Amino acid sequence: RPSFCNLPVKPGPCSGFFSAFYYSQKTNKCHSFTYGGCRGNGNRFRTIEECRRTCVG
């Protein structure tokens, strides 16, 4: 799996409300979170399917 999958979930400092998904190394699953719309990191996906394809081993 790519190293960015292991980054902590980071909603970012902006105040938008965008549905997104991140991979949790602890559970080896993808979970939903609310993305603020700016910054954040590479552990952010538009769909749970994309998250699973990329990060779940």
Curated annotation (Swiss-Prot):
InterPro entries for the chain: Kunitz_BPTI, Kunitz_BPTI_sf, Prtase_inh_Kunz-CS, TFPI/VKTCI-like
A GO molecular function held by the record: toxin activity
GO cellular component terms listed in the entry, alphabetical order: extracellular space
Entry comment describing in which tissues the protein is expressed: Expressed by the venom gland.
Domain BPTI/Kunitz inhibitor: 5-55
Keyword field: Disulfide bond, G-protein coupled receptor impairing toxin, Secreted, Toxin
Localization per record: Secreted
Pfam families: Kunitz_BPTI
Function: Interacts with vasopressin V2 receptor (V2R/AVPR2), probably in a selective manner. Inhibits vasopressin binding human V2R in the nanomolar range (Ki=7.34 nM), and also potently inhibits vasopressin-induced cAMP production (IC(50)=26 nM). In vivo, intraperitoneal injection of this protein into rats increases diuresis by 8.6-fold, without any loss of electrolytes.
Protein name as catalogued: Mambaquaretin-4
Family named by the database record: Belongs to the venom Kunitz-type family.
Domain notes: Exploits its two major loops and engages more positions in its interaction with V2R. The pharmacophore defined by numerous amino acids positioned in loop 1 (9 to 18) and loop 2 (34, 39 and 44) may be at the origin of the absolute selectivity of this protein for V2R.
SUPFAM superfamilies reported in the protein's UniProt record: BPTI-like (SSF57362)
Cysteine disulfide partners in this protein: C5-C55, C14-C38, C30-C51
